[in-house]
Amino acid sequence: MINNFINKGILILFMSMTIVEVGAQELGKVWSNAVGVEERAVIESKGLAPVLARGIETPPPFTNLRAAAEWEEIEALTIAWEGFPCILKQIVSASISECRVIIFTENPSSTSNYLTGSSCGGALNLDNVDIIEQDLNTIWIRDYGANTVYGSWNDDRILVDWIYNRPRPDDDVVSDALGEYLGIDVYSTTAEPYDLMNTGGNFMSDGFGTAFESELVHNENSGGSNWWTTFPNHTPTEIEGIFETFMGIDTFITMPTLPYDGIHHIDMHMKLLDEETLLVSQYPSGTADGPQIEANIQSVLQNYTTKWGTPFKVHWITAPPQQGGGYPNSGRSESVV
């Protein structure tokens, strides 16, 4: 039995675009999670050539699919080495004693030298680190990385990859690179009638067939087009069917998007700590996204229960009422959060 899985990645919480220079390593533009005016101009000047077909585009041939939960034991933590090297090095340092670390980078020698150099905590032992050369657009691998699914509940591990909801073609194929490197089949929701656009920051699984999302998943799969793509066209029922067919999700909890949250990822304000516990941001009364968050959680409590048939436990944590603060996102590598 295989009881570990490949983490879909880690999100580093920086929302500004900047030039990063640390010691002798200088990195280029670091794009924010949402595509801004400057990045769009770069994309349009270079042209966009997405890889439309990739992975296995038919449903996994298993009858007991289970999408892994983030807190389960992991085999490896995946990192996109694209900006913020000092922080990424600290993440590697904290993780290498807990699990294997797989780093995607456009310059393996530079990344290796930085990890073994004296800056930001000193030299690291790379025995438990795999460095893979890979073209990248951004750091946000939590959003575009692969999802671990078991075909036979705890055996027959596969990776499931969606259409990424950003015009970043290099990022969108990282899951295929990971699958090839590890020898794991990658099933992709890239072909009709199973085409589905989604992002890791807007998906949480309890490991027992229940998933949480904002209604962004409906908005981005209801047809139409924008400046860079034509969206898949499905009803909410069809969307839920694709999640069940590829990932074994049989209870799909969606919540209205928030009025002030620009990217509408649920991990901006909540975290599923285990199969029965929610960590949720709490704003001052009547402030910002607080009322909608409270309404969403109340709806969850009124209409859904845990795997065990009990009410979800909710832990509220104080959130800043304005831009510039943090939110309860994290990545996990075994006991390290």
Model-found features: residue ranges?
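Bacterial N-terminal signal peptides
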Residues: G9-E21
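The feature marks the mature, well-folded catalytic cores of soluble enzymes
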Residues: Q25-V337
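Bacterial N-terminal signal peptides that target proteins for export
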Residues: M1-I10
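Generic low-polarity alpha-helical segments
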Residues: M1, I19, G23, S335-V337
